[in-house]
From Swiss-Prot:
It comes from Thermococcus gammatolerans (strain DSM 15229 / JCM 11827 / EJ3). Pfam families: EFG_C, EFG_III, EFG_IV, GTP_EFTU, GTP_EFTU_D2. GTP binds at residues 28-35, 94-98, 148-151. This is Elongation factor 2. Disulfide bonds: none annotated. The keyword Metal-binding does not apply.
């Protein structure tokens, strides 16, 4: 095992030299080659065998588990790369595989300082490339560009060198346009990617070769040589002349920042505490002697060790046996094992210093996004997931004895993919799986079958709707069952600007730590500052304000009122679907002095009924989720595809031609999109490539709303007739 020990010794030595560390990720549109690139980088750095890496995608799904273990489960892989005679430690963090991470600040982006953006040379910059790039730049992650699948330009599209260079120039211009739009002010110009300085590389991850201008200058290999070797089919020659991992990892070392550089500008942006405090200064300097602070970015279930939490160490040193605080969970824990990932295996270490990615056990119940420190400090900005699951299926194990295995599998899927919501009901054995669309759920169900060998019954897919209001309600009185407590509230629709600010994370979900600051932001967005100061809670895109003056005992029941507000928002009055874009204001209250008469059994019904009654007086409406569909098709199928979209209440947003291919971008309600895959394959003889992403919610047309409310109520075992104001509001 000489080589392995040598590698571990090298990693241990480099861990203490932050200027030699690079924490990076790979981000791409689906199918642009992220996995192949990461596997081949690992193979090149000697972490998995080269044979495996090439074949990994050729093997089919089941046998792939060992081969694939690395891309499915490894949260982070450390490798050593020699650049100009010096060794560097490169931590590659696996960004979640599925592209349905819509707007979430993917946990991985928090832990890395730089990212390789992968773009398919044939398809160019796609909508999801924009999503991941925006994500990275929002977290102050510096990008470099890898243009992949260049072999297809040479062999399939038979383009000459000049046409290929034109294609590259367009992709680079498109990427730089996005960098200019989304990068932080101070980095807009210096983070642009350029061919001449080597912050752009191009090649084929599948065939394991790559080129960049610095590499061509250094070795004398020219693009013409590559074209000749590709046309000859000399794959070995390609790999030897222009090895992928050398070119790409050289680019990483040269252009992506080390933790010492990156933390100077990232900490003030990501952390809300006082930068001049000891901890603040230690994090700015990435000081291994400071107080230990780490942020958990991913949780993996290890068969032997239980839950392993991986995360970034911002300051201090993580040590075995250390007593730590989990800041968000408000509890203590003791770190048991400390280690790092080398390839797919976890290597135990005594300690891991600042600037590294660590894997620890012992942090029971920690969620991704948790701040862990040796003392109570301000937590890092919450990781907010703005993607909203819009389709649900119910799953049951066909065989009762598979139940524990199914629960385990669902929990694991949910931990790997934050956009998947799993509701486990151990009593009925019926579990709900909610995802971003039919396709997203199909992929997950396929994995239950192939990887977990589970036989399950799946219900037809159900769309998740939302309820909202269209105008301000009059003041409504809510009385507790014992008549001793009265609350006077109104509801009103939330302005789009405020809703967007919540989705973007500018206004954080939850009870605000600093209400004045949130009120200031709300005032900037057009709300009266005096009213905005009453902000109590932000919940799933809804808000609760206390606009009362000097009410006795109100503080004692505020927690109960917030819980009641949550209940009212989880199930709206029309069809018990979640509520969105509603502002609830408390204007006045009369509260019994004796706390026996103002417990949960009195307060919950009072506030919940009042909110629902106010909603019924405020023009209640149903919203439905929409999907954006991006379809690539040969020109002659244009008509068939637009017909298919029109039949589904969809509309065309944009069309553009790239060579022989038409790219159509449309939007349609998720409810109409079931079976779209089969229909589109049929209409285009299987020649369409397509992806979808979440496109927010829109109002259901009035003529359909009543019918849909009926269907939902029937499915939930409620009286199918849509409720009226009389049904919801208590008779005085």
């Amino acid at each position: 095992m000489g080589r392995r020990e040598e590698m571990i010794a090298k990693i241990k030595e480099l861990m203490t030299q932050p200027e030699r560390i690079r924490n990076m990720g790979i981000a791409a549109h689906i199918d642009h080659g992220k996995t192949t690139l990461s596997d081949n980088l690992l193979a090149g750095a000697g972490m998995i065998s080269e044979e495996l890496a090439g074949k990994q995608l050729v093997l089919d799904f089941d046998e792939q588990e060992q081969a694939r273990g690395i891309t499915i489960n490894a949260a982070n892989v450390s490798m050593v790369h020699n650049y100009e005679g010096q060794d560097y430690l490169i931590n590659l963090i696996d960004t979640p595989g599925h592209v349905d991470f819509g707007g979430d600040v993917t946990r991985a982006m928090r832990a890395i300082d730089g990212a390789i953006i992968v773009v398919d040379a044939v398809e160019g910059v796609m909508p999801q490339t924009e999503t991941v790039l925006r994500q990275a730049l929002r977290e102050y992650v510096k990008p470099v560009l890898f243009i992949n699948k260049v072999d297809r330009l040479i062999k399939e599209l038979k383009l000459g060198p000049n046409e290929i260079l034109q294609r590259f120039a367009k992709i680079i211009t498109d990427v730089n346009r996005l960098i200019k739009r989304y990068a932080p002010e101070e980095f807009k110009s210096q983070w642009m990617v350029k061919v001449e300085d080597g912050s752009v590389a191009f090649g084929s991850a599948y065939y394991n070769w790559a080129l960049s201008v610095p590499f061509m200058k250094k070795t004398g290999v020219s693009f013409k040589d590559i074209v000749e070797l590709t046309n000859k089919g000399d794959l070995k020659g390609l790999r030897q002349k222009a090895p992928l991992h050398v070119v790409v990892l050289d680019m990483v070392v040269r252009h992506l920042p080390n933790p010492l550089e990156a933390q100077k500008y990232r900490i003030p942006h990501l952390w809300r505490g006082d930068i001049n405090s000891d901890v603040g200064q230690a994090m700015l300097k990435c000081d291994p002697k400071g107080k230990m602070v780490m942020v958990v970015t991913k949780i993996i279930l290890d068969k032997h060790a239980g839950e392993v939490a991986t995360g970034r160490v911002w300051s201090g040193t993580v040590k075995t046996g250390q007593e730590v605080y989990l800041i968000n969970s408000k509890r203590k824990a003791r770190i048991q094992q400390v280690g790092i990932y080398m390839g797919p295996e976890r290597i135990n270490m005594e300690a891991v210093p600042a600037g590294n990615i660590v894997a620890v056990t012992g942090l029971r119940d920690a969620m991704a996004g948790e701040t862990v420190s040796v003392e109570k400090i301000e937590p890092f900005e919450a990781l907010h997931y703005t993607s909203e699951p819009v389709v649900t299926v119910a799953i049951e194990a066909k065989n009762v004895k598979d139940l524990p295995k199914l629960i385990e599998a669902l929990r694991q899927l949910a931990k790997e993919d934050p956009t998947l919501h799993v509701k486990i009901d151990e009593e009925t054995g019926q579990h709900l799986l909610s995802g971003m669309g039919e396709l997203h759920l199909e992929v997950k169900l396929y994995r239950l079958k192939t990887e977990w060998k589970l036989d399950v019954d799946v219900s037809p897919p159900i769309v998740v709707y939302r309820e909202s209001v269209t105008k301000k309600s009059p003041i409504v009185e809510g009385k507790s069952p014992n008549k001793h407590n009265r609350f006077y509230i109104t509801v009103e629709p939330m302005p789009d600007e405020i809703y967007e600010a919540i989705r973007e994370g500018i206004i954080p979900e939850g009870r605000p730590k600093n209400p004045k600051e949130v009120a200031k932001k709300l005032a900037e967005l057009g709300m009266d500052y005096e009213l905005a100061k009453g902000i109590v809670d932000v919940y799933n895109g809804n808000m609760f304000f206390d606009n009362t003056k000097g009410i006795q005992y109100l503080n004692e029941v505020m927690d109960l009122l917030v819980d009641g507000f949550h209940m009212a928002m989880d199930e709206g009055p029309l069809a018990k679907e979640p509520v969105m874009k509603v502002i609830v204001r408390l204007h006045d209250a009369k509260i019994h002095e004796d706390n026996v008469h103002r417990g949960p059994a009195q307060i919950y019904p009072a506030i919940r009924t009042a909110i629902h009654c106010a909603m019924m007086k405020a023009g209640p409406v149903l919203y439905e989720p929409y999907q954006k569909v991006i379809i690539n098709i040969p020109y002659e199928y244009m008509g068939a595809v637009s017909r298919e979209l029109n039949q589904r209440r969809g509309q065309l947003i944009d069309m553009r031609q790239e060579g022989e291919v038409m790219i159509i971008i449309g939007e349609a309600p998720v409810a109409e999109m079931f079976g779209f895959a089969g229909a589109i394959r049929g209409a285009t003889s299987g020649k369409a490539l397509w992806t979808t992403e979440h496109a927010g919610f829109k109002r259901v047309p009035n003529e359909l709303a009543q019918q849909i409310i009926r269907q939902i109520r029937q499915r939930k075992g409620l009286d199918p007739n849509p409720p009226t104001e009389k049904d919801v509001c208590p008779q005085q």
